Amino acid sequence: QIKDLLVSSSTDLDTTLVLVNAIYFKGMWKTAFNAEDTREMPFHVTKQESKPVQMMCMNNSFNVATLPAEKMKILELPFASGDLSMLVLLPDEVSDLERIEKTINFEKLTEWTNPNTMEKRRVKVYLPQMKIEEKYNLTSVLMALGMTDLFIPSANLTGISSAESLKISQAVHGAFMELSEDGIEMAGSTGVIEDIKHSPESEQFRADHPFLFLIKHNPTNTIVYFGRYWSP
């Protein structure tokens, strides 16, 4: 699915070694969205600008956290595997994503999503179909993090090659992610219906403006994918 990660112009006669990393994710929900409920709706890129998006919709029971101090809601959507979940971090305001990006760290994320904060509630979820493909040159990023020795002629890479003066010429990363309505069971199964019957009237989680999302491996509490959805 990830094509042309390295274009011909990205290498030349001086290129000795290129570090390439790619990640592909196409998730299947534990509970499918009904494709008949998907509608074209506006996605508010800013307070002044919106773009059309195919918005999926489901009324079901999910783990949700409402964080008034952070002016944000968090929704957990489980995937079919049972080990993976998607967490959506939705600011209350259209223009508030940058503020959350500046304050978020692993400790805060762990606090926001722990069982004492998240609770299972009946929620009407609006979530755009997502198909994201991005490519990044990470050379300058890695050097800014202090990994400078890899990119200079005196790099010590004898553990992988006996070639002299071997260094990494550039580091390239590609990511592809696709999410649609597909799931392994339909909303409205007996267990879900009974759960919803004993819940108050459903609230809305309307992801119609920029948000953060992450894919988490629950058994190890490991984040395997972290991204931003800011425009269709």
UniProtKB/Swiss-Prot annotation:
GO terms for cellular component: extracellular space. SUPFAM superfamilies: Serpins. GO terms for molecular function: heparin binding; serine-type endopeptidase inhibitor activity. GO terms for biological process: defense response to Gram-negative bacterium; defense response to Gram-positive bacterium; response to corticosterone. PROSITE patterns: SERPIN. It comes from the Eukaryota. InterPro entries: Serpin_CS, Serpin_dom, Serpin_fam, Serpin_sf, Serpin_sf_1, Serpin_sf_2. Induction: Up-regulated by dietary stress. Significantly increased expression between days 0 to 5 in egg whites of eggs laid by corticosterone-fed hens (at protein level). Expressed in egg white (at protein level). Coiled coil: none annotated. Belongs to the serpin family. Ov-serpin subfamily. This is Ovalbumin-related protein X. The gene is SERPINB14C.
